[in-house]
Amino acid sequence: MAKGEGHILAQNKKARLDYHIVETVEAGIVLTGTEIKSVRAARIQLKDGFAQIKNGEAWLVNVHIAPFEQGNIWNADPERTRKLLLKKREITHLANELKGTGMTLVPLKVYLKDGFAKVLIGLAKGKHDYDKRETIKRRDQERDIKKQMKHYNAR
């Protein structure tokens, strides 16, 4: 866990495979009452989500927050667009970086920090298929090395 990071509720492992993460930014999320209850219960999916900047504001799109079971009529649309809380300086910096070709903003993880839901947004550039295969190959090699070291140290 990074410094100051709280309880991790959801991670986007697919984003680490599909993108080169250039930099990360922590942002707050504007949620309704029933949404925060679902988030605290870890009923959130980041897989297809992304962030975009419109009219000087940052928005989180396609992130699924399951309806709260006891929410009844107060449940919001699970796929609705949610506003991200960033400083103006951070938004302009990200907007300037997004002008580069192939750059996008992807949510990497959602966690609680001091009782507030935060999302770690990554400024990312898409990988080619051969880059993805290389990542998988490297991960498998590291796993095999750890397994062999564990077996070797058990003697």
Swiss-Prot record:
It holds the Pfam family SmpB. One of its GO terms (cellular component) is cytosol. It is found in: Cytoplasm. One of its GO terms (biological process) is trans-translation. It comes from the Bacteria. Signal peptide: none annotated. One of its GO terms (molecular function) is RNA binding. Keywords: Cytoplasm, RNA-binding. The keyword S-adenosyl-L-methionine does not apply. The keyword Glycoprotein does not apply. PROSITE patterns: SSRP. Belongs to the SmpB family. NCBIfam families: PRK05422.1, smpB. Required for rescue of stalled ribosomes mediated by trans-translation. Binds to transfer-messenger RNA (tmRNA), required for stable association of tmRNA with ribosomes. tmRNA and SmpB together mimic tRNA shape, replacing the anticodon stem-loop with SmpB. tmRNA is encoded by the ssrA gene; the 2 termini fold to resemble tRNA(Ala) and it encodes a 'tag peptide', a short internal open reading frame. During trans-translation Ala-aminoacylated tmRNA acts like a tRNA, entering the A-site of stalled ribosomes, displacing the stalled mRNA. This is SsrA-binding protein. It comes from Streptococcus pyogenes serotype M18 (strain MGAS8232). The lineage of its organism: Bacteria, Bacillati, Bacillota, Bacilli, Lactobacillales. The gene is smpB.
